[in-house]
């Protein structure tokens, strides 16, 4: 699992195609009792283990605040 503490901008020259997958989220408390956002994605049907958990990212409160600001700025 990845613990995301901050986000850094990276410009992409071009965006390639992506496959659609299932995604879930959970609101959990870390060991210090702070609320975190966890996002999990699950393997596409073409993978060796279809539907198995593929990626897991847990966002700290600081990363959540940064993500919120990015969304408000770019996706009004």
Task: Briefly describe each language-model feature range.
Residues 1-76:
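Positively charged, low-complexity terminal tracts
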């Amino acid at each position: 699992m990845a613990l995301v503490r901050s986000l850094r901008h990276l410009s992409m020259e071009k965006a390639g195609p992506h496959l659609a997958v299932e995604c879930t989220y959970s609101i959990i408390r870390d060991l210090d009792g702070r609320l975190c956002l966890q996002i999990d994605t699950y393997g596409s049907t073409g993978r060796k283990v279809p539907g198995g958990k593929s990626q897991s990212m847990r966002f700290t409160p600081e990363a959540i605040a940064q993500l919120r600001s990015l969304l408000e700025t770019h996706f009004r």
